[in-house]
Amino acid sequence: MRDTVDPVFSLGISSLWDELRHMPTGGVWWVNADRQQDAISLVNQTIASQTENANVAVIGMEGDPGKVIKLDESHGPEKIRLFTMPASEKGLYSLPHDLLCSVNPTHYFFILICANNTWRNITSESLHKWLEKMNKWTRFHHCSLLVINPCNNSDKQSSLLMGEYRSLFGLASLRFQGDQHLFDIAFWCNEKGVSARQQLLLCQQDERWTLSHQEETAIQPRSDEKRILSHVAVLEGAPPLSEHWTLFDNNEALFNDARTAQAATIIFSLTQNNQIEPLARRIHTLRRQRGSALKIVVRENIASLRATDERLLLGCGANMIIPWNAPLSRCLTLIESVQGQQFSRYVPEDITTLLSMTQPLKLRGFQPWDTFCDAIHTMMSNTLLPADGKGVLVALRPVPGIRVEQALTLCRPNRTGDIMTIGGNRLVLFLSFCRVNDLDTALNHIFPLPTGDIFSNRMVWFEDKQISAELVQMRLLSPELWGTPLPLAKRADPVINAEHDGRIWRRIPEPLRLLDDTAERAS
């Protein structure tokens, strides 16, 4: 008996070449979509792109899939199987078993339409296990699974999936850009070969997805190493220095153009502190999705970066940060120095891990002795933080005549992450991410008086081993010697008999009697 040939299924985008369209049996493919309506439209055209006798099943998580799935009268199979499932982690793990109870999965094409943001509360470890399980299941039963995932943060989802190439045969995103759509292919593997890092413009007409005419003949760039994409503020008013330079008015436009780059130099501009987190997210997306050949530079045009912010940007994938006080000539020399570099540092797949580096201590001010020790121990154990750069531990002993509780009232830290405690007649401070050479400046900001007038002795620890060793000694202090702040004095606020006339406050006159009735009768 002649063996049957395994079918090859197709993604529902017309004019797309087979290397980016075919989905043979025995694999899992994943497409993120910015909008729910785009996801449904892509599913409908994907069904219409199959042969007449193809076995197709659609699994929906939200509502009745029969209300949104439409069969094309002239294309695709005459009938398909429809299933619903709960939008939960347990439902995902039981999916293979449930399908086996209903159909023989051999040579079937399963399309899973996820609910909006289904994967937000599912950990990356659980996602990895599920993909590994589905990969083995599709290979064993000679079937294919296409996951269509509508989500409002496709960049984050794509970054999490970039490392799943052993379980995923294809990963792409369908991005909505106002008047057009962009099909962003991270990687796609089938019987035609492997394609990666391609971006194609799509047109949607009459619910049909087609490749834009300009993309049908466009050649994907293979070597753009000489290109420099820069914010216009980086050159400080100077024109582009050569034909390789392209200037952009804002970081958003620069980021969108950099999505297609492979080895170019990308130069962002930073002028305000509130730009740091959005810029970090853009850098993380580019580094995770476009690879290690991309050179990413941040030019600080106005002083706005702290040491923790620099670590965040570098940890997200930036090659270099140019300080605000570097002249233009020095800036251009530094840009030239990154040419030909390959980014070699590890970038975590989830940016929230990196964002937690900026404020690992969500504490400020006085903490009980045990809470203080636990907080510093947690920080010392954080492997993502730089070695010997987590902060400074300072123990201060007050001069004779001043109690340590009184000295505590003068300690007024302003930064989150700066904490203190008292015990054993010492005031102990931990200044997160403070460099030891900046300690005196930091103490002058924290205390209103010179520290030499308040304290007679000071001990400092700034290396991780030193701080950890001192923590061991601090934990040996008995609770009876732990200090507590002085109680706040209760002062009754005087009641002011006044009213506001719309411009200023005016006191209300109160009538006073100089003599009471008894005194008047006596006279």
Swiss-Prot record:
Keywords: Cellulose biosynthesis, Hydrolase, Nucleotide-binding, Protease. InterPro entries: BcsE. This is Cyclic di-GMP binding protein BcsE. Belongs to the BcsE family. Disruption phenotype: Mutants lack the ability to produce a biofilm. The keyword Ligase does not apply. One of its GO terms (molecular function) is peptidase activity. GO terms for biological process: cellulose biosynthetic process; proteolysis. It comes from the Bacteria. Required for cellulose biosynthesis. May have protease activity, but BcsA is not targeted. Binds bis-(3'-5') cyclic diguanylic acid (c-di-GMP). The lineage of its organism: Bacteria, Pseudomonadati, Pseudomonadota, Gammaproteobacteria, Enterobacterales. The gene is bcsE.
